[in-house]
Amino acid sequence: TLGWAKSIGGLKALIARVQPGWVSDHICWTGVDHANLHDLLPMPCTEAALKHMVERVQRVQDFLGQRIALENASTYVAFANDDMNEWEFVSELAERADCWLLLDVNNVYVSARNHGFDGRRYIDALPSGRIRQIHLAGHEDHGDYLIDTHDHPICPGVYDLYAHTL
């Protein structure tokens, strides 16, 4: 769309001006029908969504003339029609789109607690050669679930998962 061309053109100009080591964005969606929902919403972990994301990432990388890094987002819900888990989705996306990963260890920790999986399994499944950067952060603990807020100290569990990553 025209809006996409304007925003991506502005990004390309900014990259030319500041020359960052890399550019990143979250693996998520944030709106529908031109309405911004002001949150990072999880991608359905389906082959159709994966194909869509690969095409979009390749289009952006082709336009920018460089690889981008994609960051895993914290998730709070899953889709009933998911046909793969999140780490399979992220790994396949990185490989098929030939992009970097920005691994947010806190986001893995939050998602693991919220969905009841082992975060180490997520980390171990990622193509380590594609990890360009690692983020650590804090979150809010609401007992039954965690929310990624970046406004609390990093907890020991996130540090443990980070040590496992290294």
Describe the role of every protein-language-model region:
Residues T1, I27-C28, A73-T75, N106-V110, ...:
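Active-site beta-loop-alpha junctions enriched in small/polar residues
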Residues T1, K6, D151-C155:
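Proteins with a high burden of low-complexity, intrinsically disordered sequence enriched in S/T/G/P/A and R
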Residues G3-L101:
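Active-site acidic/histidine proton-transfer and metal-coordination neighborhood
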Residues V23, D104, I134:
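Conserved, mostly hydrophobic/aromatic
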Residues L40-P44, L50, S111-L166:
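Gly/Pro-rich active-site loop or hairpin
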Residues F79-D83, V105, A112-H115:
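A short secondary-structure junction signal
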